Amino acid sequence: MNITATMGQYYYALIIDAASKILVWMDASMYGNGIKLTEHSYVGNNFVSTFEFSLSPEGIYHKSRVVWAGDYADKEPEQEKNLHEQCDEYKLIRPAEKKTTKYRFVVNHTKKQYADKSKWEMHPLPLLTAEGNGRGGGDIHDAPPCVGSWARDVISIEESLPDGEDFEEVVFE
C-alpha cells in the first residue's frame, strides 16, 4: 500500500438509487474526521461506524446502493458533474453516532461477496466502494483491484453471512 502526499481528494459517503441518483449523503468532517479516504477509513472510526450502522438490519438503509464518492472521480454520464459535486443538491444527513462492533461482515448483495472486517487493517466499506481512488493525496495508490470494485452495489452490514447463499470472501491483497 502506497499513500502519496499530493493534493488531496475529498470523499463523501452516499446512498444512491438504481439510477445513481443521490438519496442521502454524509460528510466525515461533521464527525471530526478528515475527508480524504485514508483519514477516516479504519475499523472503529466514528464516521464509518455511523454510516455503516444505517446499512445494518437496524438501519434505515439496510441493503442499499453505496458509493464513497471522490471529488476527482469521473463525471456522471451525460452530466457536467460527478456524484461528489452533485451532493449539495441533495440531502445531507448527520445521524447520531453509532457503534457497529457486533456487525462483522460487509456484504455485497450485487456481487455475492463479503468482507470480514476482522481481517482488514483498514475498513473495507470505504475502500471497496471508493470511486475516484488513486487520483489524489490521501488515496490508496498501487491499490489492489478490489478497491472501488463495489461502488454503486447493494451493500449491507451483517452479524453473520446470509443463509442459503454462497458468498465469496474479498480480501485486501
Spans of model-derived segments:
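Low-complexity intrinsically disordered segments
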Residues: 37-173
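Short, extreme N-terminal segment that most often corresponds to the first beta-strand
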Residues: 2-32
